[in-house]
From Swiss-Prot:
This is RNA-binding protein KhpB. GO terms for molecular function: RNA binding. Keywords: Cell shape, Cell wall biogenesis/degradation, Chaperone, Cytoplasm, RNA-binding. The gene is khpB. One of its GO terms (cellular component) is cytoplasm.
Length: 222
């Protein structure tokens, strides 16, 4: 965080100059007094006030600083942008650069791990829980669309075969996408089973539909 040294007639004037120079507000400024200054006698022997000031480190600053350290260690040039909605307590972090596939990893596992670490860093300094979403190349939306398509295709298979299907293990966010995609389906039901990190979604026929289909199958056999 950049620090500035400001000189003025009084500490109050020095603080005002620091606010202007740092383009911030008083609630986001921290400073230390180097010299209080004095008016002297009839202007003789007066000393200026001197302060060192800097902007208070925000949650966005903490997220960026942590990620910069990670990418420096990985020898990667990544552009980091952070948007924080203080009302909703949500932070969206977007990453841009070359070869972002390395940061995404298999089925987004590396991106999820990095998101978890950023969340730890941010929430360590916050009295309220901040929901952190880390994304690159619109991966989250593309993955959401893929999972929604998968859910509908598996639901069709379940209706056709009348057999439950267990999906591969997914993180809580991805499981919620599957549940949401099929919550209004009249014929199938979803549930999560197992323990992390192997917890997965099972898609099955609703019981009334299973009984109805069995009854119709029995009648067809007669």
């Amino acid at each position: 965080m950049d620090m500035v040294t400001v000189t003025a007639k009084t500490v109050e004037e020095a603080v005002t100059k620091a606010l202007i120079e740092l383009q911030t507000t008083s609630d986001k400024l921290t400073y230390e007094i180097v010299e209080k200054g004095s008016a002297g006698f009839l202007g003789i022997g007066s000393k200026p006030a001197i302060i060192r000031a800097k902007r208070k480190e925000t949650l966005q600053d903490k997220a960026i600083e942590f990620l910069e350290q990670v990418f420096d260690a990985m020898n990667m040039a990544v552009d980091i942008s952070v948007e924080y909605n203080e009302t909703e307590k949500e932070m969206n972090v977007n990453l841009k650069g070359d070869d972002m596939g390395i940061l995404i990893g298999k089925r987004g596992q590396t991106l999820d791990s990095l998101q978890y670490l950023v969340s730890l860093v941010v929430n360590k300094s916050s009295s309220d829980y901040i929901r952190v979403k880390l994304d690159t190349e619109n991966y989250r939306e593309r993955r959401k669309e893929t999972l929604e398509t998968l859910a509908k295709n598996i639901a069709y298979k379940v209706k056709r075969t009348k057999r439950s299907v267990s999906l591969e293990p997914m993180n809580p966010y991805e499981r919620r996408i599957i549940h949401a995609a099929l919550q209004n389906d009249k014929y199938v039901v979803t549930r999560s089973d197992g323990e992390e990190p192997f917890r997965h979604v099972i898609i099955s026929l609703k019981r009334e539909n299973r009984r109805d289909r069995n009854d119709r199958s029995d009648r067809n056999e007669k």
